[in-house]
Every structure is written in C-alpha cells, then in structure tokens.
C-alpha cells in the first residue's frame, strides 16, 4: 500500500495553486493527529500549533484525533503546547482516541471537545516494559508511577471526575462510545453535522 497524499488545486486571482490535502486543511486551522503518537507526529503537531498561533493568536485551532495512543513524552509535548498557546484548541475524535489519544482529546478547550457519533474512546494506565539491572528497573517503576499520578490528576481536572474514580477506571482498558464519553466528561458533545 502506498502513502499517497491527495493534492488539492485552487484557483485564485493569482492563478492556480496546488497543495497537499494536509497543507490545505492547515489553511483552515485544522490539524490531523492520526496513528501512533510518537516523536515524529508530536513534532509535526507542535509545529503546526505554533505556526497557527503565530498566524492568528485569537482564532481557534481544530485538532482532529484518530489515534490508538503512543508515547507519553511525545503526547505530553502536544499537551503542553496546547496549554501554552493562546488560541483555544478544539478537539474532535474521529474513529478512535485511545490512551494518549483520549488524554489529548479531553485536554481540548472546555466546551470545544467533540466526537463523531461512532467514535470510540478508551482510557487506561500508562504502559511500560523495562529490563536491565534491578536498580534500573526500580528507577523506571518509580518514574512510571509518578507519571501515572500526573496523568490521573490531569484527567480528573479535564473530566471533573473525582481522582479516586479516575484511578479505579484506568486500572484496565475502559472503553466508551461517544455518548458515554460525554457523560464521563472526556468530551462536551457528540456532533453529527458541522
């Protein structure tokens, strides 16, 4: 399977211009986060967020998410940038937002977190696998527990759920349909049409 990116041709008073589809969407302040959250995708999303802020710091940015999750540090780079920039970041789940994808979905501007009707959202605790000397494993175990506490605290703030409920719910994969994610507080509304 090839990774062809569609091109869009626009007619303007200055002539014809072609864009790849993602560049064209960026003109409308739309960023796509699809696939695994890793350093490459995080760098692209962060760069686009910063670019759009520089273009217009008062206009909302729309982050569409279809992601199974991925790296915590990469996801936190996106999260921190979403909080750092001036424009509100509206989040929209298309398909699935799981793990770090769900965390980012819930971290959009309050009142501007959405999912399409058949989207699926899943939260769980951080995953980690380490090997090496016992002392190194102990260091990594303490670190992942610290990260787990931080993520739980932010999820509690994002959802208005008690921290104790979050701790229980993330112990295992917790799947929700879009309407259930509204009740839980991960998103604000299920949208069917623009």
Swiss-Prot record:
Matching SUPFAM superfamilies: ClpP/crotonase
CC per GO annotation: cytoplasm; endopeptidase Clp complex
Active-site residue list: 99, 124
EC number of the protein: 3.4.21.92
UniProtKB keywords: Cytoplasm, Hydrolase, Protease, Serine protease
Pfam families from the UniProt entry: CLP_protease
Cellular compartment(s): Cytoplasm
GO biological process, one term: protein quality control for misfolded or incompletely synthesized proteins
Quaternary structure and partners: Fourteen ClpP subunits assemble into 2 heptameric rings which stack back to back to give a disk-like structure with a central cavity, resembling the structure of eukaryotic proteasomes.
Record's function text: Cleaves peptides in various proteins in a process that requires ATP hydrolysis. Has a chymotrypsin-like activity. Plays a major role in the degradation of misfolded proteins.
Record protein name field: ATP-dependent Clp protease proteolytic subunit
Organism of this sequence: Clostridium perfringens (strain 13 / Type A)
